[in-house]
Regions:
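Short, acidic, metal-binding catalytic loop of nucleotide-sugar glycosyltransferases
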Residues: 21-30
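A conserved acidic beta->alpha catalytic loop
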Residues: 22, 37-46, 64
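Acidic donor-binding/catalytic loop of UDP-sugar-dependent glycosyltransferases
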Residues: 43, 91-104
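Glycine-rich, basic loop-to-helix element that forms the pyrophosphate-binding segment
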Residues: 63-79
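Short aromatic/hydrophobic "clamp" motif used to bind/position activated sugar donors
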Residues: 84
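Conserved donor NDP-sugar-binding/catalytic core segment of glycosyltransferases
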Residues: 98-129
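Conserved nucleotide-sugar donor-binding catalytic segment
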Residues: 142-224
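Membrane-interface aromatic/basic loop that binds lipid-linked glycans or pyrophosphate carriers
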Residues: 271-329
Length: 329
């Protein structure tokens, strides 16, 4: 079997049928669908069982609620495919996507991770954004992370993985923003229990994952603890990158601007944490790394320059004030 499609299911009775139909209508059919019902109390269990009776490629696991990571890990343990992909039960994939991405993997059999485009649909309105890629092969995790700005789309879905990658790597149970805490290990940016994987990573412009913003979902209702997971995951990745770059002038110059953009992303999460709690984080590593980078290259990103001028605490207060004034308009 070529592909295992793992779909965690939890209280998505209104969208689950369209999700499954978008897969079952694909021209490529060498796959299994593993539906992991994570203790849903709506009609999802019935829907899962009905699809399983209609098509023997659909397998169902009913379990007690353990969260998204636990559901994915459960599916991985049951997967039989050479490759694994994840689809959320409130999303769909475009017609022809599976045949296109599998054809790409057959053409480049050394590929361990293939990332393909995403159509991001915001709410129920017509607003859409296409996350697209060029045909590029990466054998360096830092290049992939910074040049593709992966930190902005650390999605478990919209990727095809060799199943072997998950022999020693799993999703962290009980934590939201779990993708940010997992993707860096899968791409070899961070060591998992002391060992790095060294995958061949490819991006492609074929196929399309259709993501729908869920107003009741984790991202839309993130708590301080959730955002801290995001901050912590990105901070670990930044520290790993800075450790690998060290004082190598060529690498500092190569990654100068892309590092600043990544640091700005982390700083924005820090500012959000302050807005939620009114508390400053104790000696955030990103502040130190901005200062260190500024000794070697010119800081070009405005927010980082402002950070160096007025300091972290003042920037937190200023950001909160600006947001308060903006919301009054």
């Amino acid at each position: 079997m070529k592909l295992s499609i793992i779909i965690p299911v939890y209280h998505t009775q209104d969208t689950l049928p369209s999700c499954l139909d978008s897969i079952l209508q694909q021209s490529f059919n060498d796959y299994e669908i593993i539906l992991v019902d994570d203790g849903s109390t709506d009609d999802c269990p019935k829907i899962c069982d009905a699809y399983s009776r209609q098509d023997d490629r659909v397998k169902v696991i009913h379990k007690e609620n353990g969260g998204l990571s636990d559901a994915r890990n459960t599916g991985i343990l049951q997967a039989k495919g050479e490759y694994i992909t994840f689809i959320d039960s409130d999303d769909t994939i475009a017609e022809g996507t599976l045949s296109l991405v599998i054809e790409k993997i057959i053409t480049y059999p050394e590929t361990d991770i293939l990332e393909y485009p995403v159509m991001e649909r915001l709410g129920n309105g017509p607003k859409e954004h296409l996350l697209s890629f060029k045909e590029i092969e990466y054998q360096n995790a830092i290049d992939y992370w910074l040049e593709e700005k992966v930190y902005n789309h650390t999605y478990a879905w919209n990727k095809i993985y060799k199943r072997a990658l998950f022999e020693h790597i799993c999703f962290p149970k009980g934590k939201n923003f779990e993708d940010v805490l997992t993707i860096p290990y899968l791409i070899g940016l961070l060591p998992y229990h002391g060992s790095f994987v060294t995958p061949n990573i490819r991006t492609t412009n074929v196929g399309c994952y259709e993501y729908r913003w869920n107003a009741k979902g984790i991202t839309a209702n993130a708590t301080y603890k959730d955002l801290y997971n995001l901050y912590d995951g990105h901070t670990q990745s930044l520290q790993a990158i800075m450790n690998k770059i060290g004082s190598q002038e060529g690498l500092i110059l190569k990654y100068s601007l892309s590092l600043q953009e990544f640091m700005t992303q982390i700083l924005n999460v820090l500012l959000d944490l302050y807005e939620l709690s009114g508390k400053y984080e104790n000696n955030p590593p990103v502040i130190h790394h901005v200062e260190k980078l500024g000794k070697s290259v010119k800081i070009k990103v405005f927010k980082l320059r402002l950070l160096n001028i007025i300091g972290y605490h003042n920037l937190c207060r200023l950001n909160k004030l600006v947001h308060r004034l903006y919301r009054r308009k």
